[in-house]
Each structure stands twice: as structure tokens, then as C-alpha cells.
């Protein structure tokens, strides 16, 4: 008879192999899906994985699009280390963008070096406040944080859709759902001329290093409930 037992320690080999297995399974799943759709799976995988790396501009665009994902992953890793599940990163990122973008639009005519710090600060606060909602519901009403944080992501996307289709839509944007272009004072400095690669990538890499050092020196502890000691 077989029994399942919890590991005393995490397997280091499985920790190393898990990302590799995830990539392999993703590729195999893609091959199966494209084959079922009667599409060339190898050409599709080439377009997805290789083609963006064949030009310098493609590489920089890949880095630009990966930068917010890196920051999101770093933020989530802290909660996961404490066994706190947060499935609402997309919504928190979106609300941070709304708060920061709204600040940039409000200060669009201001020519001051203080505009960028204000935009960054409001972006952080927007994400924090949105993340506090499922935390409050969990502590006050014991609501499942996985469900509430996930559902709030859709709410955030609807708010963003309303803003870019309504009050924030650029009058000169040919009716596209987008805001006005932010002023240069609200934008991070460009690192490579002719691309969108900006200082945000440096911030993301620095945050990875800092959080790695923090988590590698931190013990994960979680509590499910508190009890009074019983007398012997």
C-alpha cells in the first residue's frame, strides 16, 4: 500500500528541474495545439521564440515587455515566501498604471523634475491600495484571497477600459482608446536611442537582486491559527 508523506525539506533537484519541465511541457502543448489546428508547429514556435531575437529592436522590445513582468514576479515572490497567495497581480498592476498615468496626465503641463517621482509614487500607491482590498476582506470576513484578488483584476481592467474610452481618451487620437502622450518629464530616461528601452529595466534587475538577497536570508513561516497553551 502506498502512502503520501510531506517532505521534510524541499528537493533541490526538483526546484532546479521544475522551470525546465514547465518550458518543455509548454512547447509540447504548443506543438499539439498547432498540429490540431493544421498549422506548422515549428514555424509557429520559431515565430514565437526565435524571431524576436533576430533583430536588435526585437530584443529591446522583448526586454521592455518583460520588465513589468519581472517587477510583478518579484513582488509576488515576497508574498509566496510567507505563504500568502495573491492571484490579482494583473489588477494591482493595472490600478498602479491608472494611478500613475492619471498623475502624469494631471501634471502634463508641468515642467519639473518632481513629476516623475510623483508618477512613480502614485503608481506604487495605486497597486498597494488595490492589493489591500483582498487583504482587508480576508482579515475582516475571512474571504478567500485567491478568489477576491482574481475577481478584482477584472474590475481594474473594466475601470481602465472606461477611462481610455471615456474621460481620458485623447481628442486627437483618431478615436482610438488611448490617453494623451505623457510629457517627457513623466517618462523614464531612454537607455538606447531609437528604442523604448528605459531605466525601468535597470530598476527591475536591481529589485531582483535585492529581493533575492532578502529571501535567501529569510525563513518562511506561516501561521494558521493561535491557541492558548494547555496545562499539563
Provide a role label for each language-model segment.
Residues 23, 97, 101, 153-157:
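Residue-level recognition of pore/gate-forming positions within transmembrane alpha-helices
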Residues 17-34:
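N-terminal signal-anchor transmembrane alpha helix
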Residues 149-221:
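Transmembrane helix-bundle core of multi-pass membrane transporters
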Residues 1-21:
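Transmembrane alpha-helical segments of polytopic membrane transport and secretion proteins
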Residues 224-229:
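Conserved small/polar residues in nucleotide/adenosyl-binding loops
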Residues 32-37, 47-107, 120, 124-132, ...:
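Single transmembrane alpha-helix segments in multi-pass membrane proteins
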Residues 31-52, 167-178:
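Interfacial/capping segments of alpha-helical transmembrane domains
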Residues 14-18, 56-63, 88, 190-200:
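Interfacial loop-to-helix junctions that mark the boundaries of transmembrane helices
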Amino acid at each position: 500500500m502506498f502512502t503520501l508523506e510531506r517532505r521534510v525539506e524541499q528537493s533541490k533537484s526538483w526546484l532546479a528541474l521544475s522551470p525546465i519541465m514547465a518550458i518543455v511541457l509548454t512547447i509540447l502543448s504548443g506543438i499539439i495545439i498547432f498540429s490540431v489546428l493544421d498549422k506548422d508547429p515549428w514555424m509557429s514556435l520559431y515565430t514565437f521564440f526565435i524571431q524576436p531575437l533576430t533583430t536588435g529592436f526585437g530584443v529591446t522590445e522583448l526586454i521592455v515587455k518583460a520588465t513589468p513582468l519581472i517587477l510583478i514576479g518579484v513582488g509576488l515572490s515576497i508574498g509566496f515566501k510567507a505563504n500568502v497567495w495573491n492571484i490579482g497581480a494583473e489588477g494591482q498592476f493595472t490600478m498602479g498604471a491608472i494611478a500613475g498615468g492619471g498623475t502624469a496626465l494631471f501634471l502634463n503641463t508641468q515642467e519639473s523634475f518632481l513629476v516623475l517621482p510623483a508618477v512613480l509614487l502614485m503608481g506604487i500607491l495605486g497597486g498597494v491600495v488595490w492589493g489591500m482590498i483582498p487583504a482587508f476582506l480576508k482579515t475582516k470576513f475571512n474571504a478567500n484571497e485567491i478568489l477576491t484578488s482574481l475577481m478584482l483584476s477584472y474590475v481594474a481592467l473594466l475601470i481602465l477600459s472606461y477611462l481610455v474610452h471615456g474621460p481620458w481618451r485623447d481628442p486627437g487620437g483618431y478615436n482610438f482608446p488611448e490617453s494623451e502622450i505623457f510629457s517627457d518629464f513623466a517618462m523614464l530616461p531612454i537607455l538606447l536611442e531609437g528604442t523604448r528601452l528605459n531605466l525601468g529595466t535597470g530598476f527591475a534587475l536591481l529589485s531582483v537582486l535585492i529581493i533575492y538577497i532578502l529571501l535567501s536570508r529569510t525563513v518562511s513561516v506561516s501561521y494558521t491559527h493561535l491557541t492558548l497553551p494547555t496545562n499539563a
